Amino acid sequence: MDKNLHQPLGGNEMPRFGGIATMMRLPHVQSPAELDALDAAFVGVPLDIGTSLRSGTRFGPREIRAESVMIRPYNMATGAAPFDSLNVADIGDVAINTFNLLEAVRIIEQEYDRILGHGILPLTLGGDHTITLPILRAIKKKHGKVGLVHIDAHADVNDHMFGEKIAHGTTFRRAVEEDLLDCDRVVQIGLRAQGYTAEDFNWSRKQGFRVVQAEECWHKSLEPLMAEVREKVGGGPVYLSFDIDGIDPAWAPGTSTPEIGGLTTIQAMEIIRGCQGLDLIGCDLVEVSPPYDTTGNTSLLGANLLYEMLCVLPGVVRR
């Protein structure tokens, strides 16, 4: 029997400034039976107590959802029709502890254990980049070590920040130490700016990561690069983590730690669309800080990139 697939609420059914502010105005579901019926789900993690400069990413999930009213169900560029083949909903936010980072990390891992237990592929609205560590911890229990496509201005491989081992800049150092990643299947794209030492990006390379600095991406299409990325990370489950500061602040000023000389919005779409065919088992879009962009454009960009992630999930049909 065909599944009853949830559909976004369209702008001709309800004005875009009305309706319930879920992602794409999809149904909000929470009961165990409803969760069991989902293939993928949008979930918010409104955390910003792991940031080292600007706060405000706690408001990211809410504003990304608000801007997502502009997104329509069919991808006219790629032909992807995610709502024709996947059952997708918004399952709300993780109730983090906003006063205790380590407790928040524990709660996130526990909640993703539950989400993955329902067979749901999570599309996460951040929140700062600390959240990816507990998500990867939960994912390892279900999928084992995973490959990673990581877009960011920063490598996030600090050993510590002010003596703390858990923060938004230590995520992938901890992930390596905890054996969460298949290091020969990891690519970091968009790294740039200055370092505290001349070797700051080399730690990643020494682990087996492919590091693509932003300068290698300037003035060109990234479609050829993504062919190489698919070759590098394919052959197993892959997680996609996209820090909005990977994009130049001319397009994405609303973020925690902006760096000039970044990727364009077009390159961002090329990267995500270039993940088509990979065995994606989860994605996140992190570090949107709405208070630093009153136009809403950074949140709108985040919403569109999450939609593009949905469009490249396994099982999505094309029209």
State where each predicted segment sits.
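Conserved alpha-helical scaffold segments that buttress catalytic/binding sites
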Residues: 2-319
